[in-house]
A protein has these predicted regions:
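Short hydrophobic/aromatic-enriched beta-strand-loop microsegments
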Residues: 91-98, 147-152, 190-198
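Phosphate-binding and adjacent anionic-ligand microenvironments
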Residues: 125-127, 164-340
C-alpha cells in the first residue's frame, strides 16, 4: 500500500503463510553479514502461476452478477491484469481505473489507502472496490459513495458463511483497530470475537489457533482460511459480491441494517525518529490522563507503523465532537512530548 520507493519482497513459508516474528528477526540480524556472489544469474518467466490463480478465482463466480455495476481501482499494482480478465469473462458491468502500472505509479493517488480517487469516479448507484498495490487488501465504496472498510466486509462475509454453514466454531478474528460498533454487531449475531494485535500475520495465527473461517483487519486485509491462508483482495471481493447476491441486498442497505459504527479518527504522524517502547508507554500514560480529564466515553490507540516512519493515533468515541476534540488535544500533547 506504500509508494514505489518502499517496494520490496515478502518471504512466505512452505504453508503459504507470512513468517513468524522470531524468524523475521533472525533473517534481519544476519542478512547484512551474508556475502552474495558477485555474478549474474538467469531467470525464467512463466504464466503458469497466473493461469492457476485465474482458474482458482474464476470457479468461485457461481452467483448472479446482473445486479452489480462495479468500478475497480487496481492501484496500478499486481491485480491490474487478472481483475480485468476475471470481470470480463464473467460478463460484469464494470470499469477499471488506475490500471496502467509503469513501475513507479503503484499506489500513487489511488488504491485502498487513497480511496478519494475511486469515490470521485463513481456515479450514483455504482459499487466501488479498491485494492492496494500487492492486492492483499480490499476497501469498498457503497452505492451511496460511502467508504466501507474491512470491519463491514468481515461482518458481511461472516454472516454469509454462517448462513451457509461454513463459519467454523462461529469464530470471527479481528484486531484492536476494529470499531466498537463492529464488535457489537459480532456479538448480536452470536459470533465469538477473537481480538489480536494489529497485523494480518497475528490474525492468521489466531485463526489457526481457534480454527476460524474468517478474520481480518479494518484496513482491508481479510483472510478466508478455507480458501487461502493469507489475505487476498480479489478473493475478498468475490466473497463480498457473493454475500450481497445471497442476501439479495446492496452494500449500503447491508451496512444500514447490520452495523452502527462509532465515529473514529486516525491520525498518522510522520516522524524522523520513531518512539521506542518506553516512549510509547509514556505516551499511553499521557493519553490515559487526558481521557480521565476529558471523561472520554470511548478509547484511543497509539502505535508505531509497521511499514512506514509514522506514529498512528486512533481515537474512537460515541459522537464526532468528542472524537475531534480529544484527538486534537492528544495529538498536540504527543507532539510536545516528542519535541522535548
Amino acid at each position: 500500500h506504500n509508494p514505489s520507493e518502499y517496494n520490496g519482497i515478502k518471504l512466505i513459508d512452505e504453508n503459504g503463510s507470512k513468517l513468524q516474528d522470531e524468524i523475521e528477526l533472525a533473517i534481519e540480524s544476519n542478512i547484512e553479514n551474508i556475502s552474495l556472489p558477485n555474478t549474474h544469474t538467469s531467470f525464467k518467466e512463466s504464466q503458469e502461476g497466473f493461469k492457476v490463480y485465474f482458474e482458482f478465482l474464476n470457479q468461485l463466480f457461481d452467483f448472479d452478477l446482473t445486479s452489480f455495476d462495479l468500478v475497480v481501482d487496481s492501484a496500478n499494482g499486481s491485480a491490474y491484469k487478472i481483475i480485468e480478465k476475471l470481470l470480463d469473462v464473467n460478463d460484469f458491468e464494470f470499469n477499471i481505473i488506475a490500471n496502467n502500472p509503469d513501475g513507479k505509479n503503484i499506489n500513487l493517488d489511488s488504491g485502498a489507502t487513497n480511496i478519494d480517487n475511486l469515490i470521485n469516479k463513481l456515479k450514483n448507484g455504482q459499487l466501488g472496490a479498491a485494492f492496494d498495490g500487492d492486492a492483499d487488501r480490499l476497501i469498498m465504496v457503497d452505492e451511496s459513495g460511502t467508504t466501507c472498510n474491512g470491519d463491514v466486509l468481515i461482518l458481511l462475509i461472516a454472516k454469509y458463511l454462517s448462513s451457509t454453514n461454513q463459519l467454523k466454531n462461529d469464530v470471527v478474528v479481528s484486531t484492536v483497530m476494529s470499531n466498537f460498533g463492529f464488535k457489537n454487531s459480532i456479538e448480536k449475531n452470536n459470533f465469538k470475537n477473537i481480538e489480536t494485535a494489529v497485523g494480518d500475520k497475528y490474525v492468521a495465527e489466531a485463526m489457526v489457533e481457534h480454527n476460524a473461517s474468517i478474520g481480518g483487519e479494518q484496513s482491508g486485509h481479510i483472510i478466508i482460511s478455507d480458501k487461502l491462508p493469507v489475505g487476498d483482495g480479489l478473493l475478498t471481493l468475490i466473497y463480498s459480491l457473493k454475500a450481497l447476491s445471497f442476501f439479495k441486498t446492496t452494500l449500503v442497505q447491508f451496512r444500514e441494517d447490520n452495523i452502527e459504527e462509532y465515529p473514529q479518527k486516525l491520525v498518522n504522524l510522520e516522524l524522523n525518529d520513531m518512539p521506542n517502547i518506553q516512549q510509547i508507554k509514556e505516551l499511553e500514560t499521557i493519553a490515559k490522563l487526558l481521557a480521565e480529564e476529558k471523561e472520554l466515553d470511548g478509547r484511543y490507540l497509539i502505535r508505531n507503523s509497521g511499514t512506514e516512519p509514522m506514529l498512528r493515533v486512533l481515537v474512537e468515541a460515541r459522537d464526532e465532537d468528542s472524537v475531534a476534540e480529544f484527538s486534537n488535544n492528544l495529538i498536540n500533547k504527543i507532539k510536545n512530548f516528542l519535541q522535548t
